[in-house]
A protein has these predicted regions:
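Flexible "arm" and connector segments at domain edges
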Residues: 1-65, 71-96, 100
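Single conserved hydrophobic/aromatic residue that forms the stacking wall/gate
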Residues: 97-109
Length: 109
């Protein structure tokens, strides 16, 4: 169990902080042992659960499941940050390039 301050509402930054705490040398042994391969099933399961929430058009369930997907994405990115291979900003940069490229092409066409 981690010691993290209780709040009425947690933020994105809190999630990032908690994931870093869990993966720290003195963090959670289970979380520290995870790899992309060992976490693959959890990642896919959360994505499928989010898709089911979409099918049900249930906003509360969507919120919960999208939070789980977000946690999985950040967890896997954090593993890569630890390995020095890429950062959250690298992923964000590529995401924005993928979004903006079709828009830019449409505007100049």
């Amino acid at each position: 169990m981690i010691n993290y301050p209780e709040k009425a509402v947690y933020t994105y930054d809190d999630l990032v902080d908690i994931l870093r705490i869990l993966r720290a040398p003195d963090g959670c042994p289970w979380d520290r042992e995870q790899t992309h391969e060992s976490n693959r099933r959890n990642f896919l399961e959360e994505a499928y659960e989010a898709a089911e929430a979409f099918d049900l058009d249930d906003p509360e369930l969507m919120k919960e499941e999208l939070g789980d997907v977000l946690m999985q994405v950040l967890f896997n990115i954090h593993m890569e940050e630890e390995a020095g291979r890429f950062t959250t900003d690298d992923v964000t940069d590529l995401s924005l390039i993928h979004i903006s490229e079709p828009t830019r092409l449409a505007l100049i066409s």
